[in-house]
Amino acid sequence: MIDPVAIQIGPFAIHWYALCIMTGLVLAVYLSSKEAPRKKMTSDDVIDFIIIAFPIAIIGARLYYVIFEWSYYSKHLNELLAIWNGGIAIYGGLITGAIVLFIYCYYKVLNPIRFLDIIAPGVMLAQAIGRWGNFINQEAYGRVVKALPYLPSFIQKQMFIDGHYRMPTFLFESVWNIIGFTIICYLRRQKKLLLEGEVLAFYLIWYGIGRFVIEGMRTDSLIFIGLRVSQIVSIVLIILGIVFVILRRRQKGIPYYQE
């Protein structure tokens, strides 16, 4: 088993989980900052937004998780803030971050759809990297399998949990997001192919499909009234993405992402 603590300095510990999240964040900020000037925004617009949104999104992600696991946390109040042990729900962070983004764009007089187009690929890459934090913490895994012979030994060992090998759903989602990131980075450079807003739509549809399928393989899903919460949210994202594309294509005067 891999030690979840990457660096220990006296009483202070830096966890792999945090390093994965921060690595993803740094890459997302870098990519989005490079893209912003191409869309008539500045890198400062992106950086200022991240400084505001990231801590709020982390709070939202934790709150989302705690709400749906309240039966546990109501009896373990001392663990409410223990995010280094995991328990950060991506959808909670995305929802909170989106709310902050629209407020931020309103006050900065920026086009929120264009802003979302700019940051969506970076967010997808950050999610791919962040899933490796789940791997280190031995969470977000799937059902029991007999063996994992097709994977490197370090993954096999880490996925041996409670006496059984577990399906590495974290890896499936990470790979899915990397593929999606690669595709959308290619598509958005093609002239007169995607309309503004369709980079965002691609993210919603691609991530929604992948998360819906992979969530069905997991054994630690958040459940509400007998349903997997993330699958419900995934369906909503897919529908929103498809409807958004249809409406944009019907509307006249929408510029292409790449003229």
From Swiss-Prot:
Membrane topology qualifier: Multi-pass membrane protein
GO cellular component, one term: plasma membrane
Enzyme class: transferase
Gene Ontology biological process terms, A to Z: lipoprotein biosynthetic process
Alphabetical UniProt keywords: Cell membrane, Membrane, Transferase, Transmembrane, Transmembrane helix
Location of the protein in the cell: Cell membrane
Pathway: Protein modification; lipoprotein biosynthesis (diacylglyceryl transfer)
InterPro entries associated with the record: Lgt
GO molecular function: phosphatidylglycerol-prolipoprotein diacylglyceryl transferase activity
Enzyme Commission (EC) number: 2.5.1.145
Membrane-spanning ranges: 9-29, 47-67, 83-103, 109-129, 167-187, 194-214, 227-247
Binding site for a 1,2-diacyl-sn-glycero-3-phospho-(1'-sn-glycerol): 131
Protein family: Belongs to the Lgt family.
NCBIfam families, per database record: lgt (TIGR00544)
Matches recorded under PANTHER family: PHOSPHATIDYLGLYCEROL--PROLIPOPROTEIN DIACYLGLYCERYL TRANSFERASE, PROLIPOPROTEIN DIACYLGLYCERYL TRANSFERASE
Function noted in UniProt: Catalyzes the transfer of the diacylglyceryl group from phosphatidylglycerol to the sulfhydryl group of the N-terminal cysteine of a prolipoprotein, the first step in the formation of mature lipoproteins.
Protein name: Phosphatidylglycerol--prolipoprotein diacylglyceryl transferase
Provenance organism: Streptococcus uberis (strain ATCC BAA-854 / 0140J)
